[in-house]
């Protein structure tokens, strides 16, 4: 797209070597599971996004190939190919083989750059069995090839001249090393969600994704940027005002962009980004926004006598944010990330800048749009009334201490251990299964809480109504960390919550209701990795005195073929946990030596918010459309 040559070998700064990457990949990409695998793609795409932020690229193509490789193509300036003085090698080779070698560390080339770990394509190269690069710049097409991170001798070559009018740019194609990654199969949906998010955050950049394996493809281009992001998140919700509120500003080299829209939902949905990185743990930009938002709303409400119903109280932040969908995006030349997963923005100066911008621009917006201000404040006042009503009920559910066993629910069969790190709570569907679980468990560290029937769908109710539900109250009390904004994970009595429901449609529904409760009102449990779904076997196969358990039909068929010579004595399908006796339940589902647990994680909070709203919210239309779109993907249906 651009012929600007300020980006050359001289701008490539080298910080350290690559030796340790293959030995300790998790240090560089977070993990070697599916999340780490997809992070390789994000690292390469981030380089293209940096070119876009610098104004040199407006199209990025990601392709999943049938041979298991991925290619990322952009129309930026192309990676420099001239000789690097320090190394006496092409800059392209240095970038691909030396950790932290790149123009990101030279502010002349990139004022702002993304990349959570910021490790660059050299790490992608180190963790790939093979990598190929094609660069179009300096009037020619250049190629290079690497194997296990090593440049191949005489593989760097000038292939041909650029055609007149042909775009500059870079294509990187890599094959992840299956000796390092637990899986090398890329998931289209995971990449699609992240690339859609990047397109929203970088208006005017077209990002496409294609999958040769399935012929699926998606293209994203959002001229409206984060305005359109908020509209997308609110597609399934009823907005309280027509237009998305949007403002942006720049101060001290830091760009601030904020979009928001209030809805009649009970759950808020605020997503904060720094240099395109989803800061799931929040940070100074989010704190600044929340502080200013609450102050602006209260200032306007008090000036216009709108808080008379609250007995002299002001609105709290949680009241103002109820049903609010917002996206905060900042671009910082030197972001500092902290927190457990390095997804919390730590730059102290950002808070004041975001606060000031929001106070000034949102305050002005309210004065110029009184109808919108009134709609937002009326909703917040309603939320404050409900909060006060919920306060009394909430007190009943809060545990005095994480280690006390007084006033626990009568139906809870608690464990002997008082150490949350070794304690686990099985949340079991039905009294009959609960009885088997209580008898089959290891009392030292396993607690059992049977739930009767289906709990309330919390997506449709405020906290005061939720806390009237006996089963939910028992669950909150048993967990011990409180609920809602005041939930304290340090007070949780168990560090493993295991949802154990039947392997049928009703069981799946109960599990979904429980996950909705945990996601909306005790989300830190999911974010900390404390929540699991038990995976009880679906089938038991007997043959000549031997017993085999199968998790699904494919495993059942394999056992019948390989272990039973195609002629089993008996095949039993477990319809419910209650059909298993205590010993069977222990052996198959509860014994840490044998069991299979599925950890519940949230990769993408915006996508999760939207999905919970579609599946569990009030609007029927989006749910109906979702079912139509995905009916063919259903693995089993009870009719």
From Swiss-Prot:
There is a cross-link at residue 624 (Glycyl lysine isopeptide (Lys-Gly) (interchain with G-Cter in SAMP2)). Pfam families: DNA_gyraseB, DNA_gyraseB_C, HATPase_c, Toprim. One of its GO terms (molecular function) is DNA binding. It is an enzyme of class 5 (isomerase). It catalyses: ATP-dependent breakage, passage and rejoining of double-stranded DNA. Residues 423-537 form the Toprim domain. Mg(2+) 1 binds at residues 429, 502. InterPro entries: DNA_gyrase_B_C (IPR002288), GyrB (IPR011557), HATPase_C_sf (IPR036890), Ribosomal_Su5_D2-typ_SF (IPR020568), Ribsml_uS5_D2-typ_fold_subgr (IPR014721), Topo_IIA (IPR001241), Topo_IIA-like_dom_sf (IPR013760), Topo_IIA_B (IPR000565). Mg(2+) 2 binds at residues 502, 504. It is found in: Cytoplasm. GO terms for cellular component: chromosome; cytoplasm. Its cofactor is Mg(2+); Mn(2+); Ca(2+). The record marks 454, 457 as: Interaction with DNA. Binds two Mg(2+) per subunit. The magnesium ions form salt bridges with both the protein and the DNA. Can also accept other divalent metal cations, such as Mn(2+) or Ca(2+). Gene3D superfamilies: 3.30.230.10, 3.40.50.670, Histidine kinase-like ATPase, C-terminal domain. Its EC number is 5.6.2.2. The keyword Amino-acid biosynthesis does not apply. Residues 392-402 have a biased composition (Basic and acidic residues). Residues 392-416 are annotated as: Disordered. Keywords: ATP-binding, Cytoplasm, DNA-binding, Isomerase, Isopeptide bond, Magnesium, Metal-binding, Nucleotide-binding, Topoisomerase, Ubl conjugation. GO terms for biological process: DNA topological change; DNA-templated DNA replication. Belongs to the type II topoisomerase GyrB family. A type II topoisomerase that negatively supercoils closed circular double-stranded (ds) DNA in an ATP-dependent manner to modulate DNA topology and maintain chromosomes in an underwound state. Negative supercoiling favors strand separation, and DNA replication, transcription, recombination and repair, all of which involve strand separation. Also able to catalyze the interconversion of other topological isomers of dsDNA rings, including catenanes and knotted rings. Type II topoisomerases break and join 2 DNA strands simultaneously in an ATP-dependent manner. Heterotetramer, composed of two GyrA and two GyrB chains. In the heterotetramer, GyrA contains the active site tyrosine that forms a transient covalent intermediate with DNA, while GyrB binds cofactors and catalyzes ATP hydrolysis. This is DNA gyrase subunit B. It comes from Haloferax volcanii (strain ATCC 29605 / DSM 3757 / JCM 8879 / NBRC 14742 / NCIMB 2012 / VKM B-1768 / DS2). The gene is gyrB.
């Amino acid at each position: 797209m651009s012929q600007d040559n300020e980006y050359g070998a001289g701008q490539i700064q080298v910080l350290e070597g690559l030796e340790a990457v293959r030995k300790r990949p998790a240090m560089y990409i977070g993990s070697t599971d599916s999340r780490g695998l997809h992070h390789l793609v994000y690292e390469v795409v981030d380089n293209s996004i940096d070119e876009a932020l610098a104004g040199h690229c407006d199209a990025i193509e990601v392709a999943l190939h049938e041979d298991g490789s991925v290619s990322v193509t952009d129309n930026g300036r192309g990676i420099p190919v001239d000789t690097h003085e320090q190394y006496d090698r092409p800059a392209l080779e240095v970038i691909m083989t030396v950790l932290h070698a790149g123009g990101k560390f030279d502010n002349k080339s990139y004022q702002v750059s993304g990349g959570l770990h910021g490790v660059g394509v050299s790490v992608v190269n180190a963790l790939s069995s093979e990598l190929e690069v094609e660069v179009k710049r300096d009037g020619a097409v250049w190629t290079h090839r690497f194997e296990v991170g090593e440049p191949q001798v005489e593989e760097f070559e000038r292939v041909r001249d650029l055609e007149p009018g042909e775009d500059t740019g870079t294509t990187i194609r890599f094959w992840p090393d299956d000796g390092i990654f637990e899986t090398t199969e890329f998931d289209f949906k995971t990449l699609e969600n992240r690339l859609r998010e990047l397109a929203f955050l970088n208006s005017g950049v077209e990002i496409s994704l294609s999958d040769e394996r399935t012929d699926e493809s998606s293209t994203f281009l959002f001229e409206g940027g984060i305005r359109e992001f908020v509209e997308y998140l609110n597609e399934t919700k009823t907005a309280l005002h027509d237009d998305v509120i949007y403002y942006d500003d720049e101060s001290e080299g830091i760009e601030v962009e904020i979009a928001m829209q209030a809805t009649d939902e009970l759950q808020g949905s605020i997503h904060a980004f720094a240099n395109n990185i989803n800061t799931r743990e929040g940070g100074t930009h989010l704190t600044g926004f929340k502080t200013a938002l609450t102050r602006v709303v209260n200032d306007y409400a008090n000036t216009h006598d709108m808080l008379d119903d609250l007995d002299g109280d002001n609105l709290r932040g949680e009241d103002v944010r109820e049903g609010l969908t917002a996206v905060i995006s900042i671009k910082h030349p030197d972001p500092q990330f902290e927190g457990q997963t390095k997804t919390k923005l730590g730059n102290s100066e950002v808070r004041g800048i975001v606060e000031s911008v929001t106070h000034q621009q949102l305050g002005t917006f309210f004065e110029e749009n009184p109808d919108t201000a009134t709609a937002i404040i009326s909703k917040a006042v309603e939320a404050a009334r409900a909060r006060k009503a919920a306060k009394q009920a909430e007190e009943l559910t809060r545990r005095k201490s994480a280690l006390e066993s007084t006033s626990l629910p009568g139906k809870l069969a608690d464990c002997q251990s008082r150490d949350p790190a070794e304690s686990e709570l099985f949340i079991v569907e039905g009294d009959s299964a609960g009885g088997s679980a209580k008898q089959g468990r290891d009392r030292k560290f396993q607690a059992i809480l049977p739930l009767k029937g289906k709990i309330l769908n919390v997506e449709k109710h405020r906290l005061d109504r939720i806390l009237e539900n006996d089963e939910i109250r028992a669950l909150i009390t048993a967990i011990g960390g409180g609920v809602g904004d005041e939930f304290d994970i340090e007070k949780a009595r168990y560090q493993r919550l295991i949802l154990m429901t039947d392997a049928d449609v009703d069981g799946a529904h109960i599990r979904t209701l429980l996950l909705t409760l945990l996601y909306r009102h005790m989300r830190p449990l999911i974010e900390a990795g404390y929540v699991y779904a038990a995976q009880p076997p679906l089938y038991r196969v007997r043959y000549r005195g031997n017993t085999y358990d199968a998790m699904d039909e494919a495993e059942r068929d394999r056992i019948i073929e390989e272990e039973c010579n195609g002629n089993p004595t008996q095949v039993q399908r477990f319809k419910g946990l209650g059909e298993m006796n205590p010993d069977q339940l222990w052996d198959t589902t509860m014994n840490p030596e044998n069991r299979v647990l599925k950890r519940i994680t949230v990769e993408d909070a915006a996508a999760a918010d939207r999905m919970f709203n579609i599946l569990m919210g009030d609007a029927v239309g989006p749910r109906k459309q979702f079912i139509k779109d995905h009916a063919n993907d259903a693995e089993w249906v009870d009719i």
